[in-house]
Amino acid sequence: MKSSLKQWRRLALGLILVWALLFLALLSYFMESRVDDPHAAAALSYTDTRRLTSLQGNPRTIMATHLGLATSSAPSTSSNTQQEQSQEENPSADPQPSPLSQEAYPYPDPQSLAAWSAFGTQDVGSRSTGVSRNRERQEYNQDSPQEDEDEEEEVIGGEEEDEEGGDEGRGRTTKRVARHGSSDPHEYYVPRYKSIVHGLWKGSLSMGMLSPRLQRAMKDYLNNNKHGVAYRGHRKAKQSRQQVLCELKKREKIRTLDGAEMPFSKLGWQKIVPALPLSQIHRPGLKTCAVVTSAGAMLHSGLGKEIDSHDAVLRFNTAPTVGYERDVGNKTTIRIINSQILANPMHRFNRSSLYKNVTLVAWDPAPYTLNLHQWYSNPDYNLFTPYMEYRMRFPSQPFYILHPKYIWQLWDVIQANNLENIQPNPPSSGFIGILLMMSLCEEVHVYEYIPSLRQTDLCHYHERYYDAACTLGAYHPLLYEKMLIQRMNIGSEDELKRKGKVTLPGFNKVHCEP
């Protein structure tokens, strides 16, 4: 009896062991089949892998692969060393915005540059190229009113800060995201965008060639007419280079607030503004001058030494030089700033070294009627109080506010040379700066106001923000400004394409009939 019971126990234990082994075998088989299944692996890793590739992949390798080029590996170096050394040597200096490093934006080799220029206008060597291209494609895929109803609502933030030619943003423009698109966006996007850049090179472009988003934004500004513009002048769209230069020369006299007009005379501004007019601070005159825009296409240009070789260099707003010397140089003679820089505490206008040891020229949009009382009581951004405070603290530094009449006269010239109605908003800082330097210099070289082969939707070389409005305009009549500047260009087409460089004669070298 006892032996029989022992046998049953052994049998039960054996069965349990067999079932356990069978269970483990099945579990092992199931797990191996899951690992070997490519669909399961793709489902688990596709999204993360794609994201990591876009962030970590070598951008030159990715672009070369896309274009079918051979690639070579090279160690990347950071451009932050110079900035760190500067901070160590001068701890009290203001921290500069973190530069987009050489690692993030490697300089393209000639082979890549040649292939890229043949392919289109992508930003070769930029880690964010894919982002920019996708945003552009989304924009240009909006070609049907019916499709627009299926998209997210676009938000345009009022005005852009500073469209100086790759530099605009008085409030950011949020692009709408298309929920549709062709299977191959290149078929639509690349030819159209490339034709726009070529149109700028030729000086022949119209609003109808822009993306639907930018067209809608421009029409909104036309309808809004915030500044009460009522242009009654003649339009001469086909004027020659000489005719345009002579027309601008007649209006070129730089005018700044001198404190003699009300309400400024009543406030004692004659004792606040500089005694020496802006037009006379560089007597007997400057030979060659550089206007350096803040456009993202300044990256990889290697134009720093050429820019610094000029007698004077004009820059805009918060554009830094530390960390970007190879591309933009480090000399600054004049800095044009819009009223936001003075009014917004985040720019640290009274303390930042960006605004020291240079000539400052500020401006703010005023009513087209030139009502100075209305402007003083209701400026776009209050620049008057910060200006007075700065002048009292640093009375020896040349600091001027452009007169609204000077700004709107420039706008009148732009409108007079276009049959289309342009945006009824002041010209961009870029256009103002170019005309200012044409009044002060014998020859003016402008960099990346009209885009080169490096054209990208990266708005500023020192910020990671993308929008086609920075190049083509929304708030400012930037598109029409650029066509007018190109009409006056006496430089070569090769320099325009390779360097984004426009050469303009100073007004003292322009000879006009009486």
UniProtKB/Swiss-Prot annotation:
Taxonomic lineage: Eukaryota, Metazoa, Chordata, Craniata, Vertebrata
Entries under PANTHER family matching the protein: BETA-GALACTOSIDE ALPHA-2,6-SIALYLTRANSFERASE (PTHR46059), BETA-GALACTOSIDE ALPHA-2,6-SIALYLTRANSFERASE 2 (PTHR46059:SF3)
GO cellular component: Golgi apparatus; Golgi cisterna membrane
Organism of this sequence: Danio rerio (Zebrafish)
Keywords: Disulfide bond, Glycoprotein, Glycosyltransferase, Golgi apparatus, Membrane, Signal-anchor, Transferase, Transmembrane, Transmembrane helix
Entry's localization field: Golgi apparatus, Golgi stack membrane
Name of this chain's protein: Beta-galactoside alpha-2,6-sialyltransferase 2
Assigned EC number: 2.4.3.1
InterPro entries hit by this protein: Glyco_trans_29 (IPR001675), GT29-like_sf (IPR038578)
Enzyme class: transferase
